[in-house]
Regions:
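N-terminal secretory signal peptides that target proteins for export/translocation
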Residues: 1-17
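Bacterial N-terminal signal peptides
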Residues: 12, 20-32
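N-terminal soluble domains immediately following signal/targeting peptides that reside
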Residues: 38-188
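Short hydrophobic transmembrane-like helices used for membrane targeting/insertion
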Residues: 3-5, 25, 30, 142
């Protein structure tokens, strides 16, 4: 009888350990697949900041570096090494600024397209940043009730489900709009 109990105990503990191991492996797989899936949800963030010190409108586009490299290869038809090649970074920066437009929407006046200057790009960790600026913006708009009309189609020609979040920071608060499927031009 003692042997049977020990054997039963052994079988139960072995099965429990196997189940626990399987659950650990399954949990790890679920966690890893969620992390990978989370990155598959293509999103870029653009920040528009009214800089009262310089009087300019600063535009900062943040894209996942991995997405930028894949998109650059698809758009330009050959592999682009954005990490190592300044030329590839500049080429992709040009792509970004050509898919972003902004206009001033002052009540009672026709839309006034703004012409941001391209300042450059840089890599910061897992992100590629692309910078633009509209100089002398604040001084020319003092006292006007205005909205910005924004077009942000960055990466949407590569991935139609691409989501582009635009955060506009002014007067101490942030307003956001999200460009997703079907949204071509939004006001903020």
């Amino acid at each position: 009888m003692r042997v049977a109990i020990s054997r039963t105990f052994f079988l139960r503990t072995t099965l429990a350990a196997k189940r626990a191991g399987l659950f650990s492996v399954a949990g790890l797989l679920i966690f890893c697949s969620a992390a990978v899936y989370g990155h598959q949800q293509k999103t870029a963030v653009t920040r528009l900041l009214f800089n009262s010190n310089t009087g300019s409108l600063e535009i900062m586009h943040r894209l996942f570096l991995h997405d930028a490299e894949h998109a650059a290869s698809a758009v330009f038809g050959e592999k682009q090494d954005i990490i190592e090649s300044p030329d590839s970074r500049a080429l992709f920066g040009s792509y970004v600024v050509n898919r972003f437009a902004i206009a001033l929407d002052v009540q009672g006046e026709p839309l006034q397209e703004l012409k941001p200057h391209y300042l450059g790009e840089e890599i910061d960790g897992q992100y590629l940043w692309v910078y633009q600026e509209v100089p002398n913006f604040a001084t020319s708009q003092v006292g006007k009730s205005l909205q910005l009309r924004v077009i942000n189609s960055v990466l949407r020609d590569v991935w139609p489900d691409q989501s582009n979040l635009v955060n506009v920071e002014r007067g101490g608060h942030v307003e956001s709009v999200t460009f997703s499927v079907g949204a071509d031009s939004l006001s903020v």
